[in-house]
Amino acid sequence: MVKEIKFSEDARRAMLAGVDKLADAVKVTLGPKGRNVVLDKKFVAPLITNDGVTIAKEIELEDPYENMGAKLVAEVANKTNEIAGDGTTTATVLAQAMIQEGLKNVTSGANPVGIRQGIDKAVAVALEELAAISKTVSSKEEIAQVGSISAADEEIGQFISEAMEKVGNDGVITIEESKGFKTELEVVEGMQFDRGYASPYMVTDSDKMIADLENPYILITDKKISSFQDILPILEQIVQTSRPILIVAEDVDGDALTNIVLNRLRGTFTAVAVKAPGFGDRRKAMLEDLAILTGGQVITDDLGLDLKDTTVEMLGNAGKVHVTKDNTTIVEGRGDASNIDARVGQLKAQIEETTSEFDKEKLQERLAKLAGGVAVIKVGAATETELKERKLRIEDALNSTRAAVEEGIVAGGGTALVSIYNKVAAVEATGDVATGVKIVLKALEAPIRQIAENAGLEGSVIVEKIKHAETGVGYNAATDEWVNMIDAGIVDPTKVTRSALQNAASVAAMFLTTEAVVAEMPEENPTPDMGMGGMPGMM
């Protein structure tokens, strides 16, 4: 494959075109009056969304240099989504603003390295100020406000707030598709641990790469399973019942894993194997928790039990098991209620007695998994297209709410970034470093400017008014009013705003210090048609 190299201004200009194409498609969705973007999907209905990272992932440009620029900004959205779960559009708008303003200065002769130092300096001060003005989230109403703003839907905010109230801020909340038109909240008892399936061939839904087991048996052991012969007797008993099985073991590999996968693919039985959670003594304790929750026994040498002698009566039972590549959730464990209560009491006593903060934290985690529940938000809609769009919004809102509980909230609608403008402007710097600071200052205005423009207003006027308004006062684009943003419930999680600014600055600094770009060029003469087999090439 032939490769082409572009240098300096040519390289940056070519990539900027891609940055602008992606960012312009994403930023129209920002704010309460933002628009939707329609994404073409092969073989299925188009997806209508206002989720920044979903749009960014779909964009592929023909020109290789433009595509590289677009992918750089898509990385900002991806990274922000990974860290905070929301704020991807804001991050994209910030990155575009920094790159555009920075490129103007680099073209005029400024040193990119000096500019980078200025950007880093200004962002460090901005992050300190965001932390200083951040407000802790505690009440149910505040949690609902965060969810409502993220999803642009008060009902969704209420669902998330209720779910977190019922299972705790750190509880497990999942989002599923409803069979009806209404969105509903359902809370079910359950336990989750951070271990996924041993092989992707165990999934029951290859599109989502998940394994859902209905009414499964659960084999719990602290042994390593390498030989298929060790578990063959119990699997033969399982086949007679036509029920699936979840195998929780120290590890499942070798001959055992191969045969489980082969039999799964042949349809002989449905089995999913996962590694046991935790390590050492803590693993044994967590397996005992799981056994009590599901009414099973831990197959362990400590009790003189062998895998070959395992019977169906020793297995745990659950209503449903949900397994992803990273997590396993066991819902409706069918253990004896009195045994579960006794175990909960035992854990509470251990928490009171322990002096180690680390041990206390781990015991509280186990208690939450044993006594806590799983909240399920069942999303309903009239059409499949609306369902997908609504589901994406609820996922963003849930992530946003968790982020708010973790690091607090700041005034929303881009107000927080403008309110720290003067503090960042006070950063002492000279020359190209000062230019880098000014680039960040310009970017701080970009989100509120875009929100205003999406609402049909002049962004510059709104920005200047906020700069001279009282702290916390901002523009509510939904109602066209000037209000105290936090009092009005228009808030953003500090973590989301922080992550968006950090990631945008990181990519912008890398972009501006790029001096050469190497791209693969498409072949001008594709391979000619070789004709049909056994016949000469056709003209």
Curated annotation (Swiss-Prot):
Subcellular compartments: Cytoplasm
GO molecular function terms listed in the Swiss-Prot or TrEMBL record: ATP binding; ATP-dependent protein folding chaperone; isomerase activity; unfolded protein binding
Reaction equation(s) it catalyzes: ATP + H2O + a folded polypeptide = ADP + phosphate + an unfolded polypeptide
UniProt GO cellular component terms: cytoplasm
UniProt-listed Enzyme Commission number(s): 5.6.1.7
Keywords of the record: ATP-binding, Chaperone, Cytoplasm, Isomerase, Nucleotide-binding
Pfam family, one: Cpn60_TCP1
Major localisation: cytoplasm
Binding, ATP: 29-32, 86-90, 413, 476-478, 492
Gene3D superfamilies named in the record: GroEL (3.50.7.10), GroEL-like equatorial domain (1.10.560.10), TCP-1-like chaperonin intermediate domain (3.30.260.10)
An example Gene Ontology biological process: protein refolding
Cited function: Together with its co-chaperonin GroES, plays an essential role in assisting protein folding. The GroEL-GroES system forms a nano-cage that allows encapsulation of the non-native substrate proteins and provides a physical environment optimized to promote and accelerate protein folding.
Family listed: Belongs to the chaperonin (HSP60) family.
PANTHER family in the record: 60 KDA HEAT SHOCK PROTEIN, MITOCHONDRIAL
Subunit structure: Forms a cylinder of 14 subunits composed of two heptameric rings stacked back-to-back. Interacts with the co-chaperonin GroES.
Protein name: Chaperonin GroEL
Naturally occurring in which organism (per UniProt): Macrococcus caseolyticus (strain JCSC5402)
Upper taxonomic lineage: Bacteria, Bacillati, Bacillota, Bacilli, Bacillales
